[in-house]
Amino acid sequence: MVEEATTQDQEHNIKLVFIGDTAVGKTSVIMTWTQERFPVGYEPTVFDTYYGTKNYAGKEVKLQIWDTAGHDDLGRLRPIAFVNTDCFLICFSLIDRNSLKRACSKWVAEVKATAKNCPIVLVGTKLDLREEREERARETSSKVEQDKLL
């Protein structure tokens, strides 16, 4: 059974949920950020949870990071991860032009339907593999403004 957190605990605990298409790099971003290592090879995720601690503004912030499956077959399970989320990070691949479109049409809609007032951050992945940087940057900025994302 989950215990209720005190107000003080809630101020220092943040739940982040990463969502996006299969193979856009959600797990790679999470592992690089929390474990300071880049994963070798690709293994599809169903659900996974990572924990980390970061120092922000002189305070220790405990992170609970949910890595969700991008595969459509698991779409009914995904909202389980959405409960009590503080921020959604919607990932898209910078090397796949359609990935940004799906992020904004599919994933933003899914989050807004389930967690209406939760912040959404759009995360472009695979920057190291990207070409046509300026054009993609303009497209991304336009989508961020249009959908009121961070």
Predicted regions and their residues:
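The conserved Walker
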Residues: 22
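Post-Walker A helix-loop "phosphate-sensing" segment adjacent to the P-loop in P-loop NTPases
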Residues: 35-43
